[in-house]
């Protein structure tokens, strides 16, 4: 009886294990079909896209490292913010990594990739500069479709600037005497339709503008974040996203923690090698100063030469004799 019971247990355990294995295999096999049929990005696909070895992310890292670094920081910000407000943190993180892939088309026209070189916009009309900046959203959605990033990520790329105005070049056009149409300097939208898209919009604007802070203390960082977020809110960009005032407060706190950690000051460590060098020079100086007396006693014929060598050692030097002094 015991033997039969043991066999039955092993048989049932084997069946259950096989069933679990087959279920997992089927799930992985049909995941792409589900994504295509229902235009839904599964969690498995998001985790795959988060791998920094993905071709698009590698292109960002090599071709536009400034934008790549910006995207990494934004991805950390949105992940923390999404967790704070109960949004989809994985979707936010992945979308943030890809939100600026459209900048691959004209990388040198974005300030984070110029590395103190000439600003190409200086030779362009404001309208042309605005057109280039506006194009990165359209180009980004095209690349997202080509690489099958999924509808949710495409939507966030399309919405992460909403219908915002490119204020710098619009003001520049007005100052140059033109009569610009405001719609020519606005992103086509739509405004963020989900909390995840709104979180990416806020983090993107906050991170990019925080680079202008000259003395990024925690208080100034927090004030800066609140100013940027209030501006976006007052423009109505968040009206369709379902973010609440409570959510905005939590996002501000989360962003502040990330940026404060990014901009934290480091301790200036003392140069220990300098102290070691000074200590090692002292015996040499004492040795050189002792040499003339020793040689004066043993070799009277070089007394004047040694005296000249000793007088050539300047105060505070390492004790080296003049070029013509004795060894």
Language model segments and positions:
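Juxtamembrane or sensor-core-proximal signal-transducing alpha helices
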Residues: 2, 24-47
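Generic detector of short, locally flexible boundary/turn motifs and exposed helical patches
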Residues: 12-13, 23, 40, 173-174
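Proteins with a high burden of low-complexity, intrinsically disordered sequence enriched in S/T/G/P/A and R
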Residues: 2-4, 43, 86-88, 102, ...
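Juxtamembrane inter-helical linkers in multi-pass membrane proteins
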Residues: 40-58, 100
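Transmembrane helix-loop junctions at the membrane interface of multipass transporters and ion channels
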Residues: 1-15
């Amino acid at each position: 009886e015991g033997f039969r019971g043991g066999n039955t247990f092993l048989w049932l355990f084997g069946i259950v294990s096989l069933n679990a294995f087959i279920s997992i295999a089927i799930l992985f096999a049909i995941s792409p079909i589900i994504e295509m049929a229902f235009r839904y990005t599964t969690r498995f696909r998001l985790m795959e896209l988060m791998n920094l070895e993905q071709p698009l992310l590698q292109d960002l890292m090599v071709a536009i490292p400034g934008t790549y670094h910006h995207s990494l920081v934004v991805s950390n910000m949105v992940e923390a913010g999404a967790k704070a407000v109960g949004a989809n943190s994985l979707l936010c993180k992945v979308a943030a990594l890809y939100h600026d892939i459209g900048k691959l088309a004209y990388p040198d026209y974005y300030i984070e990739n110029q590395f103190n070189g000439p600003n190409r916009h200086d030779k362009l009309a404001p309208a042309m500069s605005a057109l280039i900046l506006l194009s990165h959203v359209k180009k980004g959605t095209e690349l997202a479709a080509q690489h099958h990033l999924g509808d949710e990520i495409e939507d966030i790329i399309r919405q992460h600037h909403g219908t915002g105005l490119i204020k710098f070049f619009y003001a520049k056009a007005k100052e140059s005497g033109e009569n610009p149409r405001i719609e020519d300097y606005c992103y086509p939208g739509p405004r963020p339709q989900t909390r995840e898209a709104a979180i990416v919009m806020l983090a993107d604007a906050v991170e990019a503008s925080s680079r202008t802070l000259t003395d990024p203390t925690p208080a100034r960082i927090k004030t800066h974040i609140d100013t940027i977020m209030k501006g976006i809110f007052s423009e109505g960009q968040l009206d369709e996203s379902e973010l609440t005032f409570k959510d905005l407060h939590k996002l501000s706190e989360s962003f502040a923690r990330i940026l404060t950690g990014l901009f934290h000051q480091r301790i200036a460590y003392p140069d220990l090698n300098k102290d070691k060098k000074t200590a090692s020079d002292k015996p040499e100086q004492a040795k050189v100063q002792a040499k003339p007396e020793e040689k004066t006693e043993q070799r009277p014929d070089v007394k004047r030469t040694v005296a000249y060598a000793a007088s050539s050692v300047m105060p505070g030097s390492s004790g080296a004799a003049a070029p013509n002094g004795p060894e």
